Amino acid sequence: MFENLSSKIEKALHTLRGKGSITDINVAETVKEVRKALLDADVSYPIAKEFTDKVKAEAMGRNVIQSIEPGQLMVKIVHEKLTELMGSSAVDINIKGNPAVILIAGLQGSGKTTFSAKLAYHLKNKRAKNVMLVAGDIYRPAAISQLQTLGQQIQVPVYTEEGNNNPVKIAHNAIAEARQKGVNVVIVDTAGRLAVDEDMMNEISALKRELQPQETLFVVDSMTGQDAVNTAKAFNDRIDYDGVVLTKLDGDTRGGAALTIRYTVEKPIKFVGVGEKMDALDVFHPDRMANRILGMGDVVSLVERAQEQYDEAEARKIQKKLIHNEYNFEDFLSQIAQIKKMGSMKDLVGMIPGMDKLTKNVEISDDAFKPIEAIIGSMTPYERRNPQCLNGSRKQRIAAGSGRSIQELNRFLKQFDDTRKMMKMVSKGNTKMPIRKRR
């Protein structure tokens, strides 16, 4: 996420490291490089210039405390201004209503239908809401079919009306049914177009006027950069939406849309899509995003994800097994499954401070666990539960079954043993596991 932008800003700020003081010359040099980094990220020139002018004015107006290097001070100032540019703080969606209606708008291909399902999953599992999805795209049968498939996947009902070509009536009927069934939140997916056109704008305007939704969200593909910003402005001018959703952020190396949409349309970014899975949706926190852009990671989000997947009973069971030397390959496989539920490996690594530098030339892939899973999958149930039983002949069979060499198998067994020893030390040193579920 934002790899190009991060590396260029970091390089720009590096020019102040080792300097004894802040001067007009070194600040001007740093600010110039930051501006170039923003322009390369597809940030418009007026916004990039205003941003760097603010950074420069702030830097020249501060006295450097003796214990703080000029480089550190500049990082702090850039972090503050990035956070401010993206909205300062997270803004929640309004789900107060009987039921609350959320209208989803955006161009075709922006990820609107997938986001609708992700939002339903988010509200159902993280906010304990009873949710209904409404298939309001009457022009594309594939969109209705996609929403029904996603609804089944996340176990959320999808309201459809075959033969009804009036999206306003479909939505009204869905809301009436939702009210009867005690549904808390109705999410209305709407038709998109390949480009902004008058018919589309008239339809989405009519839906907003007739439904009076508690929340209208505009969904845009972050990878389209400045085009995303222009489209966001065109929609906002017509329907005055409440917030923006940036999809495909995990594949965006530049970050121009994330940096400038809020400034341009004066509406907050509320959610970001960070993967294909239904739980790959994050509430947008400007300060955390600024951390990631500056290579400082996002430990808070990492801990939150860990807490969501954390099973206290399972953790206590594993802790007990570690103390009694009973930790086995089945337990290891179970923990891998928990890690995979937290998100893509690339995204998780990006949340750890400093890891972006260490893994700069390393290919981070979700396939990293596949060799381990293949090795453990080639063991018998007895072998998975009893690691100490693996003799030469068993190893030969497991290696052949998993398609790995004996050397690779032995390397994994050593890593497993080292991991088990380390976890045992941690477990003995703490009577409680390090992460506890929030109450």
Predicted regions and their residues:
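Primarily NTPase-proximal linker/entry elements flanking Walker-type ATP/GTP-binding cores
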Residues: 9-136, 143-164, 171-190
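Structured core elements
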Residues: 101-103, 132-133, 159, 187, ...
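Conserved phosphate-handling catalytic cores of large alpha/beta enzymes
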Residues: 171-175, 179, 183, 195, ...
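Long amphipathic alpha-helical segments used for membrane anchoring, targeting, substrate engagement
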Residues: 2-19, 288-439
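Short, small-residue-enriched loops and turns at beta-alpha junctions
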Residues: 110, 139-141, 165-167, 192-196, ...
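Residue-level signature of catalytic and energy-coupling elements of molecular machines
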Residues: 16, 42, 78, 107, ...
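Amphipathic alpha-helical interaction segments
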Residues: 29, 33, 50, 54, ...
